[in-house]
Amino acid sequence: METTNLLLPSTRRTRMGMINRTFIEDAVIVSEKEQKKEHPNFIESNTSGITLEELETNCIVPSFGDNQLTISHQTFIHRIEEAASMFFAGETFGNTEIRVSHKILGRHPSALTKRKEELKPEDETIYYQRMAFCFHIRTICREMNGEEVHLCIGGVRSLNEENLYGKKSPEKFKIFIGWRVRVCSNLMLTCDGLTGRLEVMGDMDIYIAALKLFREFNLEQNLRLLENLGRTMISQEQFCQIIGRLRLYQVLPASQMKELPKVILGDSNINAATKGYIDNPNFGLRGRAKISCWDLMQLLNEAAKQSYIDKFLERNQNATDFAVGIQKALKGEDTENYGWFLR
């Protein structure tokens, strides 16, 4: 999706020298030249890849109506990287993967009278309205239900949530930490690994919020919760019942929907999960009579990768919560009415 706006030139915002970096020397960042691409993209729908260098050199930083700069995408990324490098000092980090969407085009004032076909690259300005990024910690890895998983950190920023025509106001970001499956790049986010919508006035607030999130995230407890999903099986009949109920859920009256767990997966996500049940080489049937709740979570998380950037994290967490809820219902421990999806 592309939108064309008339933008005045804006100074690019670079990394601020506010943070003493002496305490992060022990962290190791693996450069792109040293590491080849190892896995699929962590999100697919309507996005394209971009490097940090391209963000810094090719994209302007939009400003508010009072001409105060927004926090740039690259500054957001740098602050999370710095917080991770400090908190996980001594660990080795993989490349930072960046996905963007909704390109916003503009013109420099000197090119206002030019026709579109006359424009040269230097006449145009560009920035991306939505951006997501993540990087994994190569030295914090485990085996979970037969799959290699790494601890992964990242964030999402959507400028469409900001009122750029008004005065500078708190800017909105999302930060996450959680486990990611090596073979397919599926994130497995839980509520304690996601900040929700974080509103900040400056980039140091991002740094502080990231450290708080990392401190409160229990790696091993989270790992055990997810690994336990592999111990509960789902028959083909039960899977079909779940899919049918997920479709029915979307057209229920609001009064009835309030009595059920919240599900924010859409039709396209459910269709993708159904297709994956048949042909996903890692988590589908593969000639088996049953799949596990772990497989169900992966199918739903894989399907959530087809969401737009600004909806992706919430849908991923929702998919994880749903699989955990289904497991509890199957074990007779249901306290949130997930059993409705099995009836």
Question: Which residues are covered by each model-predicted region?
Answer:
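Intrinsically disordered, low-complexity regions enriched in serine/threonine
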Residues: M1-P40, K116-R343
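A short acidic/basic microdomain associated with nuclease active sites
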Residues: M86-A132
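Feature for intrinsically disordered/low-complexity regulatory segments and propeptides
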Residues: E2-E81, S85-T92, T96-V100, I104
